[in-house]
Design a protein with these regions (language model features):
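Short active-site neighborhood of thiol/selenol oxidoreductases, capturing the structured segment around
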Residues: 1-9, 13-14, 39
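Nucleo/cytoplasmic regulatory scaffolds in medium-to-very-large eukaryotic proteins
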Residues: 3-4, 25, 122-123
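Non-globular targeting/processing and membrane-anchoring segments
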Residues: 93-223
Length: 223
């Protein structure tokens, strides 16, 4: 896995924290990862962290942006698939199982296997329909004043709990389809790192060589 921040620290990117809470403890996922994969994680760069000071001595520290990707390599260390972002446990298990098959298949058949995956996407039964997420009270209060809500919303989203795993799953399945398309077209990368850089730049819209990761947007209300 490649991620912003460190997997062994509390404040890694939000997705990786949910991997540890929702995915890795799942008995089926845990068994598959333990028995069929050689596990490795690597930080691509530090994750941005924001501190909110309440003015009375209390502070909250949260990560502000970031994403992660699970790479599946064949026995020779060549990528055969990549699972971008967070998925529900059922979908993650299905994608991992399929990617494990890619890793053991004849390399010459890899484009065709990805074409088949594009033609046969996971059925809707693989993940349950999402329930509309309930906005936290701080978000609802901010929306009463729409102008200041535009300024506050990025930080409010950061400190609000993630509640739409199924929504993330749908979004990331669409990103994963683009990875299928790349492999199906015979795309080649000079290295695993080169593939990771393309994923962060093209899929996550987060070039790793951007010093601010897109966070240096001018404040429209600054004097």
């Amino acid at each position: 896995m490649r991620l912003l921040g460190r997997l062994d620290q509390e404040l890694s990117c939000a997705n990786s924290r949910f991997f540890k809470q929702l995915l890795y403890p799942n008995p089926q996922i845990n068994e598959l990862l333990r028995d069929q994969f050689v596990l490795h994680w690597q930080s691509v760069r530090p994750v941005p962290i924001v501190t909110i000071d309440f003015g009375d001595g209390r502070r909250i520290r949260k990560t502000l942006t970031g994403n992660s990707v699970h790479l599946v390599l064949d026995p020779d260390g060549r990528p055969v698939d990549a699972l971008p972002g967070l998925f529900s446990p059922g979908v993650f298990l299905a994608l991992l199982t399929r990617a494990h098959g890619y890793a053991l298949a004849d390399r010459s058949k890899l484009p065709e296997l990805h074409r088949q995956a594009l033609a046969q996407p996971l059925p809707p039964s693989a993940y349950r329909p999402p329930a509309p997420p309930s906005e936290p009270r701080a978000v609802r209060a901010s929306m009463i004043a729409p102008t200041k809500h535009m300024v506050e919303m990025p930080v409010l989203r950061v400190v609000s709990p993630l509640s739409d795993i199924e929504g993330d799953t749908r979004t990331n399945l669409a990103l994963h389809a683009r990875i299928h398309q790349a492999f199906a077209s015979g795309a080649q990368w000079s290295s695993v790192d080169a593939m990771v850089e393309r994923i962060y730049e093209d899929l996550f819209q987060m070039p790793l060589d951007d010093p601010a990761l897109g966070l240096d947007v001018p404040d429209p209300f600054a004097a």
